[in-house]
From Swiss-Prot:
Protein's membrane topology: Multi-pass membrane protein
UniProt protein name: Sporulation-specific protein 75
GO CC terms in record: membrane; plasma membrane
Keyword Acetylation: no
Length: 868
């Protein structure tokens, strides 16, 4: 007992002797060897990922070259299966084009781009950060690095202990930062002032030019985008429910002949959606059963016609290889589909006794064959599918019929909700009317969504009609967000515990296994483990914020992405930068600020230079880790090896996976690089070497995303915001500008350079005024209404692009739009044609045999180049 108390007392004393500073400050004084070793280890791991990716990209085309498989990339015209060397030349050609794309900061957006405007602007954001930091590195590094490095390290004793405590360096690495400045070199701070002003001016020049670019580009993209002539209205006057004539009269004064069709949301729509989900599952099951029947017949018939495999190759070893491969494929098929058959062949049934009023168990052996059982299941599925189709069509027909009923307010409010979709005959008029309705009076409870993509709508939140329940969810989500931001100090505090491993291992015997004896490994672990742990901790949070945005009742995925971006940026900036920099916990920050509210500049001036080594490592390691993960896609690779390789998926399922295996949720991607950009801005003067590291890091990430968009990404971005995420990301960089100005304000004060402090205070005030004006301009200016200058430059042909088609009830309200057409793979034995003929006569089903073909081993391959 006494030993336990003594151990606890020693441990607490050990930690109590340590200052309560941020975990990033423990990297102050790290040797140059330790810094380079951590970077080198991460770079070697990135090279390993890159090498593995180059080897695997030709073997797993569905993961790494989906666009080549889908025939939508120009390089797909080459037969990659016959000449695998072409894969490597294709990659080298892509690498050859990459520097030119990176050096062109004003690369234009092509309207036929598959990945949409938001994804294009994200690539532009990465390129913009590269260009922004490259210019700063060219100017700041040659000036500031010599000033920092050759400043005197030894301070005179009578010049004050506060400078010695705050700025004395312990390694060559710290000599590259402002930590190496002494009071005698305070005259050189004028260079830091001018360069910081240049950073602010350069940022505002980039910001203003990009805002103008996004506004011009957004208008041109809107003209050709689908669903942009639709308005969603909620809380409209109940007197207008079911009165299409009244609505048309309401909008007539705005513009003659602008009104299209009104679709009120019926209250039974939730029931329709449930039936559609069941119908979609039945359609997938039906296609899967038919596919299994074809495979069953194929493997039986090929076993009889073995010469098809034996004669496929001339040489003996080739014949043996084909035979073994066929037997392996057949074994996989049998283990996957016949186990369930034999499990249901013998059943236990309860039979009533003819003598006593009791039931007794009796074994029942199912005598039907595998094919008979599958045909019986298929017949049952088709009958159930027809019944659900009839129910869905009846409900839709009822809703569509009642849309055209005479005005009956009492019955209308019972049938419909106070929510509707209105289609207009022009995108421009729809956007203008939507913006006018958005500027409602405070007493009105009208909610407007302009141009919602019907595939992006979250119907559960739209169909939620209880005001009390919606308010409860909204306030609960906001409270939980605050708890997540504040309560995440526990995982971040764990990061501080990791950095205390040497202290723990010296006191607790069993923890010595994690205390490395090798000095080199210890330096690598000290530099690398906290960074990797911080990356993992930060990556978990977006899932919480996405769920909380859904809980708030947001009605489209685009709204959720914008909401997640704002909150996740706040979280990442606080925990990745503020908490890690200033202290090991959010509560300690509050405590220090409450005790001395005016100490913010001095606090930053003391702590920021000490954390320069940590963030220099973090920026580069984060970029390499993100780029390597983007290319290798380890999760998809593991699923391919251990799940899809053993699963016989239908052609429709394989095609859907090709199109949807890669998608980006930009709301949780933008904040990561916005915060890294803020860190680069903050340390652009304090530790200018970070500017070069930011360029390298963002270039690697840009390379990985460029490859994904060119060779892999082909999914339509339903959650398109038309540049809103990009504008928010640019405005979030102001956080880096403010913290840089605060830090320099504190540094100038600590060096008794009050003239420089006054100038920096004026710069800070001008930054706040400029930021306020730009924010007001963005909020007050309607983002979807073109300027008069843009409209005056439109030709008659381009004006016609504003005209949009009308949408039916099914187009808007259906959540499952799968075709009834069944895809079957065409085989050389003609089994698919036989099955098609039989099922068309028996059940009047529709088939397509031109999309996929089946090889000799039962594997399906895409044949057609059409995207569905």
């Amino acid at each position: 007992m006494n030993a336990t108390k003594e151990l606890t007392f020693n441990l607490l004393n050990k930690f109590q002797d340590k200052e309560r500073f941020g975990s990033a400050q423990r990297h102050a004084g790290i040797s140059l060897k330790g810094f380079i070793s951590g970077i080198l280890f991460s770079f070697l791991y990135f090279l390993f990922q890159l090498s593995l990716f180059i080897i695997l990209r030709s073997r797993f085309k569905t993961i790494y070259q989906a666009n080549v498989v889908l025939k939508i990339h120009p390089g797909s015209k080459v037969c990659f299966a016959k000449k695998k060397i072409k894969n490597y030349w294709s990659l080298f050609a892509f690498l050859k084009q990459l520097p030119g794309r990176m050096l062109d900061p004003m690369e234009k957006f092509e309207r036929n781009e598959r990945y949409g405007l938001d994804n294009y602007l994200f690539l532009r954001f990465l390129k913009l950060l590269i260009f922004f930091f490259a210019v700063l590195s060219i100017i700041n590094i040659p000036i500031l690095i010599p000033i920092h490095y050759f400043s005197r390290d030894i301070l005179k004793e009578n010049e004050g202990e506060r400078y010695e405590q705050s700025f004395r360096t312990t390694s060559k690495l710290d000599k590259w930062t402002m930590s190496n400045l002494s009071p005698n070199s305070s005259n050189t701070l004028i260079c830091h002032l001018f360069l910081s002003i240049f950073v602010v001016l350069w940022f505002h020049f980039i910001l203003s030019s990009e805002l103008r670019f996004v506004n011009r580009l957004g208008y041109s993209v809107l003209t050709k985008s689908k669903y942009q002539n639709i308005l969603y209205l909620e809380g409209f006057s109940s007197k207008l429910v079911t009165q299409s004539i009244s609505l048309e009269t309401f909008f007539q004064p705005l513009h003659s002949d602008c009104f299209g069709v009104t679709h009120f949301i019926p209250k039974n729509l939730k029931k329709v959606h449930k039936l559609e989900i069941k119908l979609n599952k039945l359609q997938k099951s039906k296609e899967q059963i038919i596919f299994e029947i074809i495979l069953e017949k194929y493997f039986r018939r090929v076993s009889i016609h073995r010469h098809l495999i034996a004669n496929h190759k001339r040489f003996f070893f080739s014949k043996l290889k084909n035979h073994l491969l066929f037997q392996y494929k057949k074994l996989v098929f049998l283990t996957q589909f016949r186990i369930s058959y034999y499990c249901t062949k013998i059943r236990l049934r309860w039979k009533k006794s003819s003598i006593f009023p009791l039931y007794y168990p009796k074994l029942y052996v199912n005598t039907e064959t595998i094919l008979e059982r599958k045909y019986r299941i298929l017949d049952k599925i088709i009958r159930k599918e027809k019944l659900i189709k009839f129910q869905v069509n009846s409900l839709k027909a009822t809703s569509e019929t009642k849309q055209a009923l005479p005005d009956d307010l009492s019955s209308g409010t019972d049938i419909y909700m106070d929510k509707m979709f209105i289609t207009f005959k022009s995108t421009l008029l729809s956007n203008v009317i939507g913006e006018l309705l958005s500027y409602r009076l405070p007493t009105q409870n009208l909610k407007v969504i302009i141009g919602p993509n019907v595939n992006d709508i979250i119907w559960r939140n739209i169909l939620d009609s209880s005001p009390l329940w919606k308010s409860a969810k909204y306030f609960s989500a906001n409270i939980l967000r605050i708890f997540v931001i504040i309560g995440w100090i526990l995982p971040v505090a764990f990061l501080g515990l990791i950095s205390q491993i040497p202290n723990i291992s010296s006191l607790i015997p069993f923890t010595k296994i994690i205390h490395f004896q090798s000095p080199f490994i210890r330096e690598v672990a000290k530099n690398l483990i906290p960074i990797v742990t911080l990356i993992i901790i930060i990556e978990i949070v977006p899932y919480f914020f996405r769920w909380l945005s859904y809980l708030r009742g947001l009605k489209t995925g685009a709204q959720i992405e914008a909401d997640v971006q704002n909150w996740y940026f706040v979280f990442v900036f606080i925990h990745l930068f503020v908490v890690v920099t200033i202290s090991s916990g959010f509560s300690i920050i509050i405590e220090r600020l409450l005790n001395n509210p005016v100490s913010i500049p001095a606090l930053l001036a003391n702590d920021l230079p000490k954390c320069a080594n940590f963030f220099c490592s973090f920026v580069l390691i984060r970029g390499m880790a993100y780029a390597g993960g983007n290319l290798l896609r380890i999760k998809e690779l593991l699923f391919e090896l251990f799940y899809y390789k053993w699963k016989r998926s239908t052609p429709h399922a394989q095609f859907k996976r090709l199109k949807t295996s890669l998608f980006f949720q930009l709301g949780s991607i933008y904040p990561i690089f916005s915060v890294l950009g803020c860190i680069g801005i903050i340390y652009s003067v304090v530790a200018p070497i970070i500017l070069l590291l930011c360029c390298i890091s963002f270039s690697m990430v840009f390379f990985s995303f460029s490859y994904l968009f060119k060779y892999q990404y082909n999914k339509e971005n339903y959650s398109e915001t038309f540049g809103k995420l990009y504008i928010q990301a640019l405005m979030q960089l102001y956080a880096g500008i403010y913290f840089m100005e605060f830090c320099l304000l504190g540094l100038f004060t600590l060096f008794d350079q009050y003239t420089l402090s006054t100038i920096m205070l004026v710069v800070f005030a001008l930054t706040v005024i400029t930021h306020s004006k730009i924010s007001k301009q963005i909020k007050s200016k309607p983002q979807r209404i073109p300027t008069l200058e843009y409209l005056s430059n439109l030709t008659e042909e381009r004006k016609d692009q504003f005209c949009q088609e009308s949408y039916t009830f099914h187009d808007i309200f259906s959540i499952c739009r799968n075709s009834d057409e069944i895809w079957l793979p065409r085989d050389k034995l003609g089994i698919s044609e036989e099955e098609q003929s039989f099922l068309e006569k028996s059940y009047h089903l529709k088939f397509d045999l031109n999309m996929y073909s089946m090889n000799l081993f039962g594997d399906c391959h895409l044949e057609n180049s059409h995207l569905h």
